[in-house]
Amino acid sequence: MANSASPEQNQNHCSAINNSIPLMQGNLPTLTLSGKIRVTVTFFLFLLSATFNASFLLKLQKWTQKKEKGKKLSRMKLLLKHLTLANLLETLIVMPLDGMWNITVQWYAGELLCKVLSYLKLFSMYAPAFMMVVISLDRSLAITRPLALKSNSKVGQSMVGLAWILSSVFAGPQLYIFRMIHLADSSGQTKVFSQCVTHCSFSQWWHQAFYNFFTFSCLFIIPLFIMLICNAKIIFTLTRVLHQDPHELQLNQSKNNIPRARLKTLKMTVAFATSFTVCWTPYYVLGIWYWFDPEMLNRLSDPVNHFFFLFAFLNPCFDPLIYGYFSL
């Protein structure tokens, strides 16, 4: 087995790249037809998502103003408000960034924006995923332990605050690992291509593998697992209540009204989990495939590659339709 390069060799290689290395002009990436279609669809979904989420936010604000003066927003609507804000953040950062980057192909915004926008991109991806977890946990507690949740009214606010904090902290490494590299023409003198990448930010290959796995787990695996567990608990509780003796069920309805008023909770949380799974699975399947087999991009057709990535942009479009239908 061949020995891996020493840290000194890696450092020299990275220094050569940062000082501009020769690159054949024919090897430079270009905006293909499928790339143009991706850009068009991306900006269409951007307008759609921005309209849906902003409209729901305004509708929620108008609904709040109609309430009695000084009355606080209900816990569920507070959670939906933060999920809408998180989706709006993802819409306003990730979609335009992806669209413009596909148009320009290379990075023209400089080192500072390379780091800052990479941080904001991941932050705005963490936030909706964590808010979905908060809503799933809250709805599960509302069904399985309603009295305990009602006695502690600050649980929802605490989980929301924690979700925003974790999103900010977990995205922090982006400020360090992303950097500019410059590639030169065959003479090695004139810079012909610049890109914002993580190249040479990790001293060992497994450091990057660990970071990729951590990010993948926090963005997809862990939120999906928690949502599935919460949905399973809700289904189990509602099924048990619905199969009670009719006389006993009538008595229970006067206490918690689970069968009628909270049945839509199950439908909404299942719809959230389904939307999350359907929209993000193709994106992460492609990412994992590339992680284990970088050459797959040479075998996978360009249209299929772009199509898989576009799936992720559907999630912030679907969410306002789901919680708008079930909550208002």
From Swiss-Prot:
Q: How does it sit in the membrane?
A: Multi-pass membrane protein
- Outcome recorded upon mutating A129D: In HH7; complete loss of function
Question: By its UniProt entry, which SUPFAM superfamilies does this protein fall under?
Answer: Family A G protein-coupled receptor-like (SSF81321)
Task: Summarize the impact of N10K.
Answer: In HH7; is able to bind GnRH but with a reduced affinity in vitro
Expression by tissue, per the entry, reads: Pituitary, ovary, testis, breast and prostate but not in liver and spleen.
Molecular function terms, GO-annotated = gonadotropin-releasing hormone receptor activity
Q: Name one GO biological process term.
A: gonadotropin secretion
Query: Outcome of Y284C?
Result: In HH7; minimal effects upon receptor affinity but receptor expression decreased
Could you say what the effect of mutating L266R is?
In HH7; uncertain significance
Disease per UniProt entry: Hypogonadotropic hypogonadism 7 with or without anosmia: A disorder characterized by absent or incomplete sexual maturation by the age of 18 years, in conjunction with low levels of circulating gonadotropins and testosterone and no other abnormalities of the hypothalamic-pituitary axis. In some cases, it is associated with non-reproductive phenotypes, such as anosmia, cleft palate, and sensorineural hearing loss. Anosmia or hyposmia is related to the absence or hypoplasia of the olfactory bulbs and tracts.
Role this protein plays: Receptor for gonadotropin releasing hormone (GnRH) that mediates the action of GnRH to stimulate the secretion of the gonadotropic hormones luteinizing hormone (LH) and follicle-stimulating hormone (FSH). This receptor mediates its action by association with G-proteins that activate a phosphatidylinositol-calcium second messenger system. Isoform 2 may act as an inhibitor of GnRH-R signaling.
Similarity comment: family membership? Belongs to the G-protein coupled receptor 1 family.
Query: What is the protein named?
Result: Gonadotropin-releasing hormone receptor
* Source organism: Homo sapiens (Human)
Q: What is the lineage of its organism?
A: Eukaryota, Metazoa, Chordata, Craniata, Vertebrata
